[in-house]
């Protein structure tokens, strides 16, 4: 019983830490980590996101190091950034939180890098309101991987979001149904130095800050239309 209570307390503390205020330096580190994740995944020769999905993407979210706790209640949480395609390139990024839970025993904690790709205009639409739940408010599917994945068509009919994970060097599509995605308004305000409307930022009405230029350039490079990777 004591071990159970101790584990539960640790889980709550870890989850609370994910919601703690971040410094601008922390946010800069998060953006740089997101770019590193994107670079490492997209520079793989074959085991990567198919070209037709890259070309069709409307928004891209990267969550470096999402945690699945090694506790009785398998809480999952992570923080990341999102940018969306606009009429003149890709938007400045906003900060998001992801949280979910899988009931049951967990053995060992895991840290997993996630990439979310919206493949139509509805993919991240609910995020503009405040938050949404994957699989409920936005239909989602584990994304196809590799050049052969271009032949897969099921996702075109059934999904607004495609989700990918990398764990211990292995990259694959992953189901994230039940995971909540919400605006991190505090971190976004800290990064920009003033409150920002997610709708305004993601529609390209806010300039890309110097600290986010390299991340946005990386997204623009990898998710470029009509370009061989």
Regions found by a protein language model. Give the residues of each.
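Sec/Tat signal peptide C-region and signal peptidase I cleavage site
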Residues: 15-21
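Small-residue-enriched, tightly packed secondary-structure blocks
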Residues: 21-229
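Eukaryotic low-complexity, non-globular regulatory regions
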Residues: 3-5, 228-229
